[in-house]
């Protein structure tokens, strides 16, 4: 085992991407009952202090259906919330956009997104890396090797039975977005964003670049739902003439294996969803965002699994491997409906914020085996280099170095889809990517504070208290980037 230090560098790799074009894949899923949509208005200069560029907003088509978002318009609702939080019932205490003009027809959109060529499949994108395994030296083969024990102890995930937003493929996600510098489209780079050229956006604005949905997310475009990626958990099925094994999802997981000091190897299993549906307080939903990265970390010591860390909003829990429920010898985890926060048990998971009590919910829904469809990599902490592994040698690496957000920027107060209360927003900014999930962590916990390893599973309904300080804590950054603000995963 190599002796590797716990530090990071920028680790930029040469950019020689082939000329690729995007493909548009579509999915369908059962939408919830329709509710009235909100009007929208163009952001004002006061709503975007970090850019002085012209604001352009993508307009949705009229064919999409409205989404299921409760509209906080009645005075009774404001009174109930004010009473609940001990605040004035004056609506002036709330930040809520006035109803403005309805969305214009697509023909009147401020910009037109050109149709992307549909010449490559998602699988072809994932095999578009330019590494040649036949040229690997013995040392490089070792550097790219995934230990068999990592796969032997790969986690299972029970998705929620009533989930509306299933796992998604980041290659497909890129076909539905326009990169923006804050709220301004990056015209010269808006087309053909692929897994092999995404890092080029770092030259424009770094963390101020947002992969912004081409659609109005309140109308629930099908690609957000990912229903074609629901894993089959009863027997095997035939898909396009080929057998699809039990537990396999069409949405690939991303495995990043990180060797560390003293025989430690961390195996990060990353899961991507195109949409995060926030939780409710008194039937008001907070924390929606486009793009959602979650992960399970299995830590090994000298080849044996010793601990498991589960991502859960911005904090998460860590367990001794012996404490986790298993199928055979593999850990069993549970993904919460909407938020996709990871838990070790099924049931209700309340957590107490300054705003009030929110709940995640998990159950034994479709069983997902991420190891059946994954793209795997090794990550070197000394030079920050991500390498496609011996299992998926053609997997591209450029996307990993993208430093911006995988979703829209938090909508401004002038956008009628947005509202806030007690510092919490209905829509928040999309998350940073897998690179920024503290891959170099010394202990197994996600955050930088005290790391508590549980040797038992919590009882159902055990509440977790989250302090304002924890909410402000920046925990999903790597040591090779500056401190970040506006992190709301």
Mark where each language-model region is:
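Fungal intrinsically disordered, low-complexity serine/threonine- and proline-rich regulatory regions
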Residues: 3-59, 63-65, 73
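A domain-level signal for the mature, folded cores of soluble proteins
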Residues: 11, 36, 58-60, 67-290, ...
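Short, surface-exposed coil-to-beta transition loops
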Residues: 291-295
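Short beta-strand micro-motifs enriched in acidic
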Residues: 299-303
